[in-house]
Amino acid sequence: MPLVFRSTFILALSFCVDAWAYESDQYMNRKQDVADSLLVLNQQVNQAIDKVLRGKRPPTTRKGIARGIWREIGGVYWADKIERWAAKSHLVDKYEQKRHNSIYRNMPIWATRVNFVFGVGRSFKLNGVMVGSDKFGHFFSQGYKYYRRELRGDSDSKLLARGAFAERWLFGHLTTGVYSNADLVANYEGWLFYQSLFLDDIVSDKPAILVWREGKYVKQRPFTWADHVNAYWDEALNPSFNVPSLNKRLRKSIVALCPEAREAPAHYLVMNDQFLWTRYQHIGLKDNRENQFEAICGL
């Protein structure tokens, strides 16, 4: 194995003791009838917020509240607590998918890199969107890093650039061959979540989740994933930018799925693609929309 791949695997393994997988696969199984987990996952997040607020010594600063929620539902390991819970819980319906039977199957190790070893994670339906389990970690842990840097005084452009750098080197392009635009969207929406705890209109036309009242923070409205999850969380609808060796093989695999896509195009199209691209382009997305089903299959 060449030195570059040995180094890649050493780096990956050092971070993957508690990992479920590096990437997810939203290309296959799109037509499966899977229950939407919006309500049950809303409940998990709201319970975590309530637990932080109702503790014996609840935090009284924005930094403390954000850290408390992250500790409750995020975590220092590769897979966040909510990600591990969702993967195990019978309350969360999953798409039928095996870790090594994915869009990446039969691809060589030099194309798929770490995915060749770890396979892919589970996918769920959330707010009508097919979402990989890894997006929970991006939302809570990477979003928390963005927010923490904001509190330290980093400019928006600087913290967004650091997020793109991490996707390029640690979390994505170097180790998996994939620069995930959907990961960056989840990071960004996670940052907005932490902001929306304290600021009005971060979520359009909604007050902050919390309000300062009588010397403490109290919740004035519930959290819902519907404020943050959209089609650009879906790796197939918001395609990643891949290394050439992977992209060439991935496009062939997508072509093989075109008959299914033509039978039920609604499962394979982004109805508001240009709106979402415009909304998120500034966060560091790399345009690879030529890999959308619409472009490859002529939908």
Model segments located where?
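N-terminal signal peptide c-region/cleavage motif recognized by signal peptidases
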Residues: 14-18
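Intrinsically disordered, low-complexity, mixed-charge
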Residues: 20-161, 171, 175-184, 188-299
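Acidic-residue sensor for enzyme active/binding pockets
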Residues: 167
